[in-house]
Regions:
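Conserved beta-strand residues within beta-sheet cores
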Residues: 30, 50, 67, 76, ...
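A residue-level detector for short acidic-glycine micro-motifs
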Residues: 55-56, 81
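C-terminal cap/linker of serine protease catalytic domains
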Residues: 13-16, 37-38, 86-159
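Short, well-ordered secondary-structure micro-motifs
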Residues: 43-46, 77, 100-101
Length: 159
């Protein structure tokens, strides 16, 4: 089953000023992904992975490939440049078993993300908040973004 949703959280989660800067993805750009992959103990706090943008598809497709690890639970999580700008939102990884069955090899480092220009259309800001552009190390970027990341759990059941 594939699904997408815009989730409105009824509690006050602060917007990270850095995330209000959207940039277009460019092949070769460094990115980090923040999300809640896996099960059990990995749900206690978001994890961070890094990679690059490996391929940008045309604007009509609205997606790009990244080498940042995208696993179950990362879907809907942000991808940021190292200066804290939102470049996309992760949504899928290749089906490794299917790829193995069809191609005879296991793919690695191929996650999909939606381009930030499509996300920007959903989150139109009434006013622009000036943001000083600066490079961060991955640990400090993670700490700055952490208050704005929320875990959403969906329970599927009978109708």
């Amino acid at each position: 089953m594939n699904a997408s949703a815009l989730v409105i959280i009824p509690r006050n989660i602060p917007a990270t000023p850095f995330a209000k800067d959207f940039v277009r993805p460019k092949a070769g750009d460094d990115v980090i992904s923040i999300g809640y992959p896996g099960i059990g103990i990995t749900f206690e706090q978001p994890t961070i992975t890094q990679g690059i943008i490996s391929k940008v598809f045309d604007d009509e497709m609205g997606i790009f490939l990244t080498t940042a690890a995208i696993n179950s639970g990362n879907s809907g999580g942000p991808l940021f440049t190292l200066d804290g700008k939102l470049v996309g939102v992760s949504f899928a990884a290749l089906d490794k078993k299917k790829w193995l069955d069809e191609m005879g090899q296991i793919p690695t480092d191929m996650g999909y993300a939606i381009k930030s220009n499509l996300i920007k259309k959903v989150f139109q800001h009434e006013e622009s908040i000036p943001v000083k552009s600066a490079k961060f190390n991955k640990a400090s970027l993670y700490e700055k973004m952490l208050p704005s990341i929320a875990l959403v759990v969906v329970l599927l059941g009978e109708e």
